[in-house]
């Protein structure tokens, strides 16, 4: 039996803006540089996101993919979901209603939220 890959869940800060993004990137970089990282970003506390936050998400996705890993998003509040939709970033990520669904998806137990056409 193949061992289950470890999934890291990272709570995003209240505001995904330039100052907070730098601090968050410093904390999350070790997770992104490991072999085949499996990461879930928990959006449940996020109240604001700007272009620096969107850029950070794209950077983290790119770094995870370079290591043959994956980054998934979970528990996105409506105000943040609008930003991700307007920037079309929502099309690049698997997005889940809850963190547990996102974690389970790494093991084949869950289905992402349907994105409207």
Per-segment meaning from a language model:
Residues 4, 48, 60, 101-104:
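Generic signature of intrinsically disordered, low-complexity, basic-rich segments
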Residues 97-117:
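A charged, well-structured terminal subsegment
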């Amino acid at each position: 039996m193949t061992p289950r890959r470890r999934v890291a869940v990272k709570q995003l800060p209240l505001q995904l803006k330039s100052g907070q993004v730098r601090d968050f990137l410093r904390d999350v970089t070790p997770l992104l540089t490991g072999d085949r990282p499996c990461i879930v970003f928990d959006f449940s506390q996020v109240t604001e996101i700007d272009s620096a936050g969107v850029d950070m998400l794209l950077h983290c996705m790119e770094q995870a993919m370079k290591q043959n890993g994956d980054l998934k998003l979970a528990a996105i509040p409506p105000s943040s979901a609008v930003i991700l939709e307007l920037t079309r970033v929502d099309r690049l990520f698997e997005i889940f209603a809850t963190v547990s669904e996102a974690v389970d998806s790494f093991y084949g137990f869950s289905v992402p939220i349907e994105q409207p056409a």
